[in-house]
From Swiss-Prot:
Organism encoding this protein: Lactococcus lactis subsp. cremoris (strain SK11)
Subunit field text: The RNAP catalytic core consists of 2 alpha, 1 beta, 1 beta' and 1 omega subunit. When a sigma factor is associated with the core the holoenzyme is formed, which can initiate transcription.
Region (Disordered): 96-117
Ranges of Basic and acidic residues composition bias in the record: 96-105
One Gene Ontology term, aspect cellular component: DNA-directed RNA polymerase complex
UniProt keywords, alphabetically: DNA-directed RNA polymerase, Nucleotidyltransferase, Transcription, Transferase
Name recorded for this polypeptide: DNA-directed RNA polymerase subunit omega
InterPro entries in UniProt: DNA-dir_RNA_pol_omega (IPR003716), Pol_omega/Rpo6/RPB6 (IPR006110), RPB6/omega-like_sf (IPR036161)
Biased composition (Low complexity): 108-117
Function recorded in the entry: Promotes RNA polymerase assembly. Latches the N- and C-terminal regions of the beta' subunit thereby facilitating its interaction with the beta and alpha subunits.
Length: 117
């Protein structure tokens, strides 16, 4: 049974088998955590999907790991802020709808009181 992509093709993309295993594991974890894929996959398993991306050259070892960590921290902070903003917008929309509903009820009561007089 021949595995695709072949180890030779994979080793053309990285320096060593060790680097390949580390890159594959990290990318598989990223894919599991809903990181955006770089292509359509033939495989269903995350580890094989990571190998497909490595073989295509769309995933590389980051030359500056500290910079990548900073980028990831910034990305997570941005996602957190976006979620917070979305939550705030929803709260504002709810407050607006409640105020409109309260105004309608107030007008309805006023109309009923005027009709009763």
């Amino acid at each position: 049974m021949m595995l695709e992509p072949s180890i030779d093709k994979l080793l053309d993309q990285v320096d060593s088998k060790y680097s390949l295993v580390v890159l594959e594991a990290k990318r598989a974890h990223e894919l599991r955590d809903k990181e955006r894929p770089t292509k359509e996959f033939k495989s269903v398993k995350r580890t094989l999907q990571a190998l497909e991306e490595i073989a295509d050259g769309t995933v590389k070892i980051h030359p500056a790991p500290e910079l990548k960590r900073e980028t990831l921290v910034e990305k997570r902070e941005l996602e957190r802020l976006q979620a917070k903003m979305k939550e705030q917008l929803i709260k504002e929309q709810i407050a607006k709808e409640e105020a409109e509903e309260e105004a309608k009820q107030k007008n309805s009561r006023a109309a009923k009181a005027a009709a009763a007089e």
